[in-house]
Regions:
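Alpha-helix C-terminal capping segments
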Residues: 65-74, 118-121, 286-289
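A short, aliphatic-rich alpha-helical micro-motif
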Residues: 145-149, 205-206, 236
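Conserved phosphate-binding/catalytic region of the ribokinase-like
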Residues: 1-7, 12, 26-32, 37, ...
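A glycine-rich helix N-cap at a beta->alpha junction
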Residues: 93-110
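Glycine-rich phosphate/adenosyl-contacting loop at the front of the ribokinase-like
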Residues: 1-78, 88-89
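Hydrophobic beta-strand scaffold residues
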Residues: 75, 101, 184-185, 242
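Conserved phosphate-binding/catalytic loop of the ribokinase/pfkB sugar-kinase fold
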Residues: 102-106, 118-163
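Conserved beta-alpha-beta core of the PfkB/ribokinase-like small-molecule kinase fold
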Residues: 153-233, 249-251
Length: 329
């Protein structure tokens, strides 16, 4: 069985992206700048209202895995898609990106492939309206222990915490990975996701994970505080590696007694979709290569900077060349 440097488990979502202005968001009743879960009917209304749609395989951790695969890691993604047009598109697109899509599209059943309508406003802010469909039904049976148990690194998506079988799949996969000598971590995904499942998040982080990646709001939400320093200290007390992205203020990484802060160059994003996902791709690439945490953060920042320079959540440049130019490879 193949050994992977990086395996991700998350929602397999087709992103449908369109540009708009704030008046459109207000007219359609879309809350700016956050991810909202919607029902199937609402999804059809929003899809019909989109202008000049761009369709791409998405899902937070899937984007990360694709980015890391593009950098040259042996990578695999575990997620559920239906055997419909969008599901077949998704599976093929992941394969085309150099990522092994472990589970074939699922035939039968009523739930279609998940999709997220993403509206990008003039300031680059993304407003996501996601119909989860079949992807949220992921369970332990979708996670082969032959894949999880042979992963060097495993990365889990917090959004899958919304169903008990997703939580169970995570715990089992994390334990398989660690028993096989790998390291397992999580993308916190969203402060609201933490609010819904705080106790389970903290238990998983403390007992089953080796690293956590989240933005400032997500890290704060773990311990219900507005004080980032307090949140970082408390998270670091239960997890050996904590990575906190702070948008234009850079990245803070805490590993045991070591702490580094890596600045970023402030730019106006064309599209902020995927910035955190591609940061994680770069950081995990560095981890897989055994690089220091500061270099990992710099690689992550470079990957994030590239993806916010264009529409879409995955890199368009050959990132290995970009990293070489910047002296990071």
């Amino acid at each position: 069985m193949k050994t992977y440097q990086l395996v991700g488990i998350g929602n397999a979502v087709v992103d449908v992206i369109s540009q708009c202005d704030d008046s459109f968001l207000e007219h359609m009743g879309i809350e700016k700048g956050i991810m909202q879960l919607i029902e199937r009917d609402r999804g059809e209304v929003l899809y019909a209202a989109m202008q000049e749609r761009v369709q791409t395989p998405g899902g937070s951790v899937a984007n990360t895995i694709a980015g890391a695969g593009a950098l040259g890691l042996e990578a695999a993604f575990i997620g559920r898609v239906h055997d419909d047009a969008l599901g077949r598109f998704y599976a093929q697109a992941m394969t085309d990106d150099g990522v092994d899509f472990v589970n074939p599209p699922v035939a039968g059943g009523e739930l279609p492939t998940s999709r997220s309508m993403i509206f990008v406003s003039g300031d680059g802010e993304r407003s996501m309206n996601t119909y989860l469909g079949i992807s949220s039904e992921l369970s332990s049976s979708d996670v082969p222990d032959t894949v999880a148990g042979k992963a060097q690194l495993m990365f889990l998506e917090g959004y899958l915490f919304d169903k008990d079988k997703g939580k169970t799949a995570f715990m089992e996969a994390a334990r398989d990975c660690r028993e096989g000598g790998g390291k397992c971590g999580i993308a916190i995904s969203d402060p609201f996701c933490v609010e819904r499942h705080r106790a389970d998040f903290l238990s998983l982080i403390e007992n089953d994970l080796d690293f956590v990646i989240g933005n400032e709001a997500e890290i704060k939400s773990l311990f219900e505080t507005d004080d980032l320093e307090e949140a970082l200290a408390k998270t670091a007390a239960i997890c050996s590696l904590v990575v906190c992205t702070r948008s234009g203020d850079g990245v803070t990484v805490v590993q045991g007694d070591s702490r580094v802060s890596v600045p970023v160059e402030r730019v106006v994003p064309v599209d902020a979709t995927g910035a955190g996902d591609q940061f994680a791709a770069g950081f995990l690439f560095g981890m897989a290569k055994g690089l220091g945490i500061e270099t990992c953060a710099k690689i992550g920042n470079a990957c994030a900077a590239e993806v916010i320079s264009h529409i879409g959540p995955r890199p368009k440049a050959v990132m290995s060349q970009v990293l070489r130019r910047e002296g990071l490879l």
